[in-house]
C-alpha cells in the first residue's frame, strides 16, 4: 500500500562494520558497505561437501563458523524445526550439528565453541571441537514439559521463539521451563 515500508532483506552486518553478507544463488557472499562490491564467497552450497540447500544462516561471534539451517518445518508462527549444519570458514569443513533428529533454536555460545539447541522439548549442548552432545534436561514431554522454547501462548502473544540464553562468558545457560501438564 501507500504507507508500506521498503526493506532490504537478508543483509547481515559483519562485526568489522565495513562489510555485510547476503545470500546469492546458494552462496553466502561478503560485500563492502562503502562500494557495494562483491568481495568473497564465504560459503557455496554447490561446492560444499555434502551439498546442502540452506534456508538461513548465523555466524559465530568471531565469524569463523556458520550455523546453517536446512529442512525447515514450521511449528507455530515464529518457531520451526530444522537440521542444522556447522561450516568452519577456516578449514572449509561442513558437518551436521546433531544426528539425533530435528532441532529448534540452535544458538552459538559466546566463544563459538558450542551450540545449544532444543530437541523434543529438551535442551542440549553440542561441543564443536569433539562433536559430543550433552543433554541438559531430560523431562521434556509433548503437551507436558517444555524446556528452552516457549509454549504456543508465549510465542504468539509475546513474539519470542527461544526461551534460553547463554551467559556472557559461555559457561552457563539459563532457560525457561513450561509445565503444561495440568492444561486441559
Locations of regions flagged by a protein language model:
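Beta-propeller folds
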Residues: 1-184
